């Protein structure tokens, strides 16, 4: 598959208000397939770093397409874990120290 020409990408986002994120779903799925192929050669699983994704829909796609080797989400803060829990995610790891005021 060839990447989309920039003109096609531009035409698809001209009708929406910016700033906005544009995700090529085919490219995302190919990246998930490649990543899963690498980790299947070993005895490891993978947790998505939410700090790198920043899209609930993309996280859902990655977890669904990644199969049993994609085990959940690594959140940067407890507040983000709570936000994602409210959206139905149930395998959450808060990776950084959390300090509450008071």
Regions found by a protein language model. Name each.
Residues 18-23, 45-46, 66-69:
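Short, contiguous strand/loop micro-motifs
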Residues 3-8, 27-60, 76:
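N-terminal glycine-rich anion-binding loops that anchor highly charged ligand groups
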């Amino acid at each position: 598959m060839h990447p989309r020409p920039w003109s096609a990408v531009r035409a698809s986002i001209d009708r929406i208000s910016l700033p906005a994120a544009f995700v090529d779903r085919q490219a995302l799925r190919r990246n998930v397939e490649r990543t899963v192929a690498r980790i299947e050669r070993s005895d490891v699983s993978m947790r998505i770093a939410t700090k790198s994704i920043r899209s609930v829909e993309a996280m859902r796609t990655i977890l669904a397409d990644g199969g049993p080797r994609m085990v959940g989400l690594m959140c940067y803060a407890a507040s983000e874990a709570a936000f994602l829990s409210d959206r139905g995610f149930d395998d959450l790891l808060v990776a950084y120290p959390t300090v509450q005021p008071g």
